[in-house]
Swiss-Prot record:
GO terms for molecular function: ATP binding; homoserine kinase activity. Pfam families: GHMP_kinases_C, GHMP_kinases_N. It catalyses: L-homoserine + ATP = O-phospho-L-homoserine + ADP + H(+). It is an enzyme of class 2 (transferase). The keyword ATP-binding applies. This is Homoserine kinase. Pathway: Amino-acid biosynthesis; L-threonine biosynthesis; L-threonine from L-aspartate: step 4/5. Coiled coil: none annotated. Keywords: Amino-acid biosynthesis, ATP-binding, Cytoplasm, Kinase, Nucleotide-binding, Threonine biosynthesis, Transferase. The gene is thrB. InterPro entries: GHMP_kinase_C_dom, GHMP_kinase_C_sf, GHMP_kinase_N_dom, GHMP_knse_ATP-bd_CS, Homoserine_kinase, Ribosomal_Su5_D2-typ_SF, Ribsml_uS5_D2-typ_fold_subgr.
Length: 288
């Protein structure tokens, strides 16, 4: 059995802790034979290979009596870069428990569990469902809407340094004035309306005018200003911090994507540039 989960990009400007899309980088978990104890084979560096791995912490929280297996983990989702690496593992762990214990969890049950573990649904929801997901988590209740993302390209610049979500949250204010909150909310409303109606020009303007988090975080990502300028020069819809950063994403028409990628590459920044597409499936399971 093989479980595959896409990367995700959350916030998309003003959709703070609420909006996310699934993108074409992937975590895969291959379930091998039963064993005396759990063991995860991987080449992902200094992460646990036993029950202390987040994958198994999650799976055993959902189904504590799972029989141990050998597993193989492969991922091209970089760690601590704002592309939902931990969310992909959480979703995979829930699906692992669901399959091995024959739990027959519904999509909503999976999302409830994932959100409880992660703390907010903006990454785990698109990892589960694919596409664009707008969600809220209030009083331990998740509400969500899944929608197709308008046809476009995502150019992701992934820096060669990590930025932990906790560090990125430390620069945020503890509160906003009522006037600021109303303005920030209205911008977010327009961004979502634009995305849902396919008006990427209007959505892009709203994304670039986020007031919830990017203005506070942009100093943590030194490449952000340069990449935004390239996007603007090439007529992209928007550039934004993916999740808490440091990955920067340029949202653009498909016919402009190659030029924007080439222009970012020409800066010779410390990192890598990737042309990504929407993943419309979310988590999937292939059985032998």
């Amino acid at each position: 059995m093989k479980i595959t989960v896409p990367a995700t990009s959350a916030n998309i400007g003003p959709g703070f802790d609420s909006v996310g899309v699934a993108l074409s980088k992937y975590l895969s978990i291959e379930v091998l034979e039963e064993a005396a104890s759990w063991h995860i084979s991987h080449d992902l560096g200094d992460i646990p290979s036993d029950e202390h791995n987040l994958l198994l912490v999650t799976a055993l929280k959902v189904a504590p009596d799972l029989r141990p297996h050998r597993l193989r983990m492969v991922s091209d989702i970089p760690l601590a870069r704002g592309l939902g690496s931990s969310s992909s593992v959480i979703v995979a762990g829930i699906e692992l428990a669901n399959q091995l214990a024959d739990l027959n969890l519904t999509d909503s049950e999976k999302l409830d569990i994932a959100t409880e573990i992660e703390g907010h649904p903006d990454n785990v929801a698109p990892a589960l469902f694919g596409n664009l997901v707008i969600s809220s988590y209030i009083n331990q209740k998740v509400n969500y809407v899944v929608a197709d993302f308008p046809k476009s390209s995502f150019i992701a610049f992934i820096p060669n340094y990590e930025l932990k979500t906790s560090d990125s949250r430390d620069v945020l204010p503890t509160d906003l004035t009522y006037k600021e909150a109303v303005a920030a909310s209205s911008i977010a409303n327009v961004a979502i309306a634009g995305l849902l109606t396919g008006d990427l020009k209007t959505a892009g303007e709203a994304i670039m005018n986020d007031r919830f988090h990017e203005r506070f975080r942009q100093s943590l990502v030194r490449e952000f200003a340069q990449i935004k300028e390239i996007g603007k020069r090439n007529g992209a819809y928007a550039s934004y911090l993916s999740g808490a950063g440091p990955t920067v994403i340029v949202l653009t028409d498909q016919d402009k994507a190659d030029q924007i990628k080439a222009d970012i590459d020409a800066l010779e920044l410390s990192g890598s540039t990737h042309l990504l597409r929407i993943d419309a499936k979310g988590v999937r399971v292939e059985k032998n």
